[in-house]
Amino acid sequence: MEDDAGNCGGLTAFALRLAKRLADDGDNSNRNVVFSPVSLYAALALVASGARGTTLDELVALLGAASLDDLEESVRRAVEVGLADESESGGPRVSYACGVWHDERLALKPAYRAADFQRQPKSSRKKINKWVSKATNKLIREILPDGSVHGGTALVLVNAIYFKGKWSNPFPRERTTTGKFHRLDGSSVDAPFMSSREDQYIGFYDGFKVLKLPYHRTMKNHGDGGDITPAILKHYGENVGLSMYIFLPDARDGLPALVDKMAVASSGTASSSFLRDHRPGRRRIKVGDLRVPRFKVSFYSEMNEVLKGMGIGAAFDVGKVDLSGMIDGELVVVEKVMHRAVVEVNEEGTEAAAATACTMKFLCLTLTSPVDFVADHPFAFFVVEEKSDAVLFAGHVLDPTSLE
């Protein structure tokens, strides 16, 4: 498992830096935030696969990779290991789907799903949203809002993730009670709190505590296929299966400082190990008062400005973008990166889904819609050699019927 964690170090660092950016965004200052780092990471990596020059360099740097090959390997490991479905072995259900839709007149490298963005943008948008809804078990019914697909759309990259897992030790529903949840502004709100008398994995650190809530699973091809036992954990190590980690600052208003601390760590050499280094030990400990709120959080954001602030301006800049490795003979620019996520945590476990969509538009009008060019009034002309830009002839025409 250590190798897997190392290969996903760029993803971990990206997750912590993005958490900081989203927390600092003024629009999010008073609302819950949930996002899927792996969904966004995979979407941006797909854009990087068709990028060249500065556009590629910025994407690779943001995603914490040494090269495009290194980035592609990181994504492969994240999908194969981090998003591996464990439902057949009694563990969480995890599904991941990736789709690419391109304007039907394009020659994409390689070819993916074709769509008639020019003549049927609304139906194309609905078709993609329907695909996302199915991939997320209807938790996310729309990733592309009205107007996000239009006649000038060249390409839409989409991925979707669905997760459903039961706790290894569920919270008894009869122990759920209403209590005060203290918000950052000092006010409080009544919320349902889950509780348990079971021993728990809890780690104590400078200024914060960490609770680990493992999801139920069984070990494939091990003995009689029963539950993971302490002996199995000792043999395989602590990092077995999927778990939720709750980072709780000691101070009621300490979350911003904790997020800052994570972001600072993500920019250094220890970026890939911060979360790993702050996991509780492998022994459960007795707890007195254990209360975790039951919640459901949904979040939608157009990520352009956040991503620009993290260093990938060229992909959105018509004067700098280079995505020539993706589409033959056409200039395109990233128009929008949209992300939606939902997470529900209750006594039984967790159900969550996320989707990321990246739309690209043409830089010129050659394919967006038919245009008129009627030279029925005076015009200028130039005869230019393309490679050297040498102008061989130049002039203007005031009357095409006159020799002079």
From Swiss-Prot:
Question: Sorted alphabetically, which CDD domains does this protein's record hold?
Answer: serpinP_plants (cd02043)
UniProt-annotated stretches for the region RCL? 349-373
Q: What are the record keywords, sorted?
A: Protease inhibitor, Serine protease inhibitor
- Site-annotated residues for Reactive bond: L363, C364
Molecular function via GO: serine-type endopeptidase inhibitor activity
Q: Does the keyword Lipoprotein apply?
A: no
Can you quote a single GO CC term?
extracellular space
**Tagged with keyword Membrane:** no
Q: Which InterPro entries does this entry report, sorted A to Z?
A: Serpin_dom, Serpin_fam, Serpin_sf, Serpin_sf_1, Serpin_sf_2
Superkingdom: Eukaryota
Q: Which Pfam families does the record match to this protein? A: Serpin
The record describes the protein's role as:
Probable serine protease inhibitor.
Similarity annotation: Belongs to the serpin family.
UniProt comment concerning the protein's domains? The reactive center loop (RCL) extends out from the body of the protein and directs binding to the target protease. The protease cleaves the serpin at the reactive site within the RCL, establishing a covalent linkage between the carboxyl group of the serpin reactive site and the serine hydroxyl of the protease. The resulting inactive serpin-protease complex is highly stable.
Q: Which PANTHER family match?
A: SERINE PROTEASE INHIBITOR, SERPIN, SERPIN-Z8-RELATED
By what name is this protein known?
Serpin-Z2B
Organism per entry: Oryza sativa subsp. japonica
Task: List the taxonomic lineage.
Answer: Eukaryota, Viridiplantae, Streptophyta, Embryophyta, Tracheophyta
